[in-house]
């Protein structure tokens, strides 16, 4: 009984409004009332009206809605609905939606306070939870893009995706326009340079005139320097391979005459300043054939020393693993002739490009986030607090991944056209990399400790990753602490347990053998697991994604393919280097794709700045505000630090870390 003020918010995207009428019902603990056809929702507007209700409803539990269409279906994007009881109590209820309303079925929006099954002892929301998950499991089914990989969402086309997983119009227009621009630029570069010679390293400048960053220009000018080569293992686009050596690698076989090198390495090892980057993952991967021309791969090992000034300097490069019955592979040194040493470094940089794009970026960023997305939609109803906590960090992931499978890594896609791992090698590499998806490697406190990078003052990735993890962890603990007061509450939450099990056993194909949990036994363990999911979708992906434009635009620093075999002798010349590096077309296409993926995104939500409010009430809002305050402090401190650095490290700066895997 009484008067209610109802406010309905419609999204801002181009087609968010609807010409169809919307009917509403209020559902409370003690009754339900139909409000009738209340509005035709208008794009980017909050529409408010009052209703007089003759029934006593008690505390509101749901708003039900139905969109009625006459002749033409017109989808509506509903942000949220708020209902305020006018009178003595002035109770206000928040019903988040943030999805498309399609068809003429009745949809129920539960109140935004959120609860677990344990926190709903009367079972007021039980039927809704079960119905929602039943519908979602039909919409979100597991699929397998390639045998031997972790699972993905079923469906090979964008139209196979649930409508709520597709780009809104602004994002779609920007993405497709940038793709068209990149292809136009590629055609122009090819036509302008079709008759030009391709004989010196300076010739790469002829295609280096669009989409450059300040750091990319620095890379062009300094890429041959050993200090910049070493720096990239610490703070470049792929800081995930470097580890402190605890012994000399078994694969490092010293040919006769290399006793002095062995002594130098053992000296650095004893001092704790010896590091390694091992690309053994590339061993025995089948190399691509592009336009009937064989391409080539190596599996390098790089040994580096950390100097007192913080610089990481290469000491030796081995391009092949030793083979039984063969002579030890040559070891390339900084004292070798300049072109010999440069070619060895180019092989390392090309190998790093392959491993970056396939393992660090696609597998450990995009495909992992897809597993989290599908499992979340299948196992957690919208009223569940973990759903509310994690769903802003899953936005657009399914569409961007379907686009990647259809364009980048598809048959005859970009990888097949220009990458030395294309033509099937990329799938083989992903399959082999799956064995290294350990739980600890997704948690920076564990991963950095395992790799011996804690305390390395010149590893800004390590410092920033650890700090960002801790900030996200406190945020997760703050939200989870509102709903889980005891470890028993975690153990008894069957939806949470199902979600964890779905990720580990189904999505990740039995990853318990790599340390992923199949159940959550305490509040601390649950918080750690959720933090891992959010960090992977935000900070970790951004640390890998954002460096592409800076480090991969100058093609000799990250060759997409190599056109001659890895050297086995030390007689390389400039002609050898140019004949090995990508040709004009391959280089131009690499630059265009890197620009499209690495450019500043105009449609981008920074970490923690999502506008969607899935929680209602002051307590979750206070936790989110504290999270944003900590992110702002970190952002400012990184800005101050970077002013003193020769090369600023930006990739984990919260203001440019994206809130989800959306590009």
From Swiss-Prot:
SUPFAM superfamilies: Lipase/lipooxygenase domain (PLAT/LH2 domain) (SSF49723), Lipoxigenase (SSF48484). Disulfide bonds: none annotated. It is a peripheral membrane protein. It is found in: Cytoplasm, Cytosol; Cell membrane; Lipid droplet. InterPro entries: LipOase, LipOase_C, LipOase_C_sf, LipOase_CS, LipOase_Fe_BS, LipOase_mml, PLAT/LH2_dom, PLAT/LH2_dom_sf. It holds the Pfam family PLAT. Its main location: cytoplasm. Its cofactor is Fe cation. Its EC number is 1.13.11.31, 1.13.11.33, 1.13.11.-, 1.13.11.12. Detected in reticulocytes (at protein level). Fe cation binds at residues 361, 366, 541, 545, 663. GO terms for molecular function: arachidonate 12(S)-lipoxygenase activity; arachidonate 15-lipoxygenase activity; iron ion binding; linoleate 13S-lipoxygenase activity; phosphatidylinositol-4,5-bisphosphate binding. It comes from the Eukaryota. The keyword Secreted does not apply. Keywords: Calcium, Cell membrane, Cytoplasm, Dioxygenase, Fatty acid metabolism, Iron, Lipid droplet, Lipid metabolism, Lipid-binding, Membrane, Metal-binding, Oxidoreductase. One of its GO terms (biological process) is linoleic acid metabolic process. It catalyses: (5Z,8Z,11Z,14Z)-eicosatetraenoate + O2 = (12S)-hydroperoxy-(5Z,8Z,10E,14Z)-eicosatetraenoate; (5Z,8Z,11Z,14Z)-eicosatetraenoate + O2 = (15S)-hydroperoxy-(5Z,8Z,11Z,13E)-eicosatetraenoate; (9Z,12Z)-octadecadienoate + O2 = (13S)-hydroperoxy-(9Z,11E)-octadecadienoate; (5Z,8Z,11Z,14Z)-eicosatetraenoate + 2 O2 = (14R,15S)-dihydroperoxy-(5Z,8Z,10E,12E)-eicosatetraenoate. Gene3D superfamilies: 3.10.450.60, Lipoxygenase-1, Domain 5, PLAT/LH2 domain. It is an enzyme of class 1 (oxidoreductase). Residues 2-115 form the PLAT domain. Belongs to the lipoxygenase family. The PLAT domain can bind calcium ions; this promotes association with membranes. Interacts with PEBP1; in response to IL13/interleukin-13, prevents the interaction of PEBP1 with RAF1 to activate the ERK signaling cascade. This is Polyunsaturated fatty acid lipoxygenase ALOX15. It comes from Oryctolagus cuniculus.
């Amino acid at each position: 009984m009484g008067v209610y003020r109802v406010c309905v918010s419609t999204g801002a995207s181009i087609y968010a409004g609807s010409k169809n009428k919307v009917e509403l019902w209020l559902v409370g603990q003690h009754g339900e009332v139909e409000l009738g056809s209340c509005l035709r929702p208008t794009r980017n507007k909050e529409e408010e009206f009052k209703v007089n209700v003759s029934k006593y409803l008690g505390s509101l539990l749901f708003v039900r809605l139905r969109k009625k269409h006459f002749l033409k279906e017109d989808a509506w994007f509903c942000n949220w609905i708020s209902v305020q009881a006018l009178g003595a109590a002035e109770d206000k209820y928040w019903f988040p939606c943030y999805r498309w309303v399609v068809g003429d079925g009745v949809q129920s929006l539960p109140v935004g306070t959120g609860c677990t099954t344990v926190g709903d002892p009367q079972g007021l929301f039980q039927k809704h939870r079960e119905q929602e998950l039943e519908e979602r499991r039909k919409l979100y089914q597991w699929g397998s893009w390639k045998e031997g990989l972790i699972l993905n969402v079923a469906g090979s086309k964008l139209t196979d995706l649930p409508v709520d997983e597709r780009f809104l119009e602004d994002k779609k227009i920007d993405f497709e326009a940038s793709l068209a621009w990149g292809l136009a630029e590629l055609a122009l570069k090819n036509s302008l340079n079709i008759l030009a010679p391709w004989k010196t390293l300076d010739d790469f400048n002829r295609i280096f005139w669009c989409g450059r960053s300040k750091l990319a220009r620095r890379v062009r000018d300094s890429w041959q320097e050993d200090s910049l080569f070493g720096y990239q293992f610490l703070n470049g686009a792929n800081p995930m391979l470097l580890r402190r050596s605890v012994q000399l690698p078994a694969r490092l076989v010293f040919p006769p005459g290399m006793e002095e090198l062995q002594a130098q390495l053992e000296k650095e090892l004893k001092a704790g300043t010896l590091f390694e980057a091992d690309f053994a993952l590339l061993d025995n991967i089948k190399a691509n054939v592009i336009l009937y021309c064989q391409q080539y791969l190596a599996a390098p090992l790089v040994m580096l020393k950390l100097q007192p000034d913080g610089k990481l300097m290469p000491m030796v490069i081995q391009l092949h693993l030793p083979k039984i019955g063969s002579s030890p592979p040559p070891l390339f040194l900084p004292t070798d002739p300049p072109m010999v040493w440069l070619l060895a470094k180019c092989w390392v940089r090309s190998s790093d490009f392959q491993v970056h794009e396939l393992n660090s970026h696609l597998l450990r960023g995009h495909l992992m986030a897809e597993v989290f997305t599908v499992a979340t939609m299948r196992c957690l109803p919208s009223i569940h607090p973990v759903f509310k906590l994690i769903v802003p960090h899953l936005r657009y992931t399914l569409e961007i991944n379907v686009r990647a499978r259809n364009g980048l890594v598809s048959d005859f896609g970009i990888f097949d056209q220009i990458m030395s791992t294309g033509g099937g090698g990329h799938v083989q590499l992903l399959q082999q990399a799956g064995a290294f998806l350990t739980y600890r490697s997704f948690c920076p406190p564990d991963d950095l400790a395992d790799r011996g990078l804690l305390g390395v003052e010149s590893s800004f990735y390590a410092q920033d990753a650890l700090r960002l993890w801790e900030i996200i962890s406190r945020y997760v603990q703050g939200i989870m602490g509102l709903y889980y007061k005891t470890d028993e509450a975690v153990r008894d939450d069957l939806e949470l347990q199902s979600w964890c099990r779905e990720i580990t056993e189904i999505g990740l194909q039995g990853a318990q053998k790599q340390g992923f949990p199949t159940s959550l036994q305490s509040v601390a363990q649950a918080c750690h697991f959720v933090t891992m999911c959010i960090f992977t979708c935000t900070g970790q992906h951004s640390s890998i994604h954002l460096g592409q434009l800076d480090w991969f635009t100058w093609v000799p620093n990250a060759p997409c393919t190599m056109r001659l075999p890895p050297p086995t002798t030390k007689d390389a010349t400039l002609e050898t280097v140019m004949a090995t590096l990508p040709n004009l077309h391959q280089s131009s296409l690499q630059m265009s794709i890197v620009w499209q993926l690495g450019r500043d995104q105009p449609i981008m939500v920074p970490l923690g700045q999502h506008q969607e409010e899935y929680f209602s009430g002051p307590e979750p809002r206070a936790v989110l505000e504290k999270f944003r305050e900590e992110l702002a402090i970190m952002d400012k401190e990184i800005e101050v630090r970077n002013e003193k650095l020769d090369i600023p490290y930006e990739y984990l700066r919260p203001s440019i870390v994206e809130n989800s895997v959306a590009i």
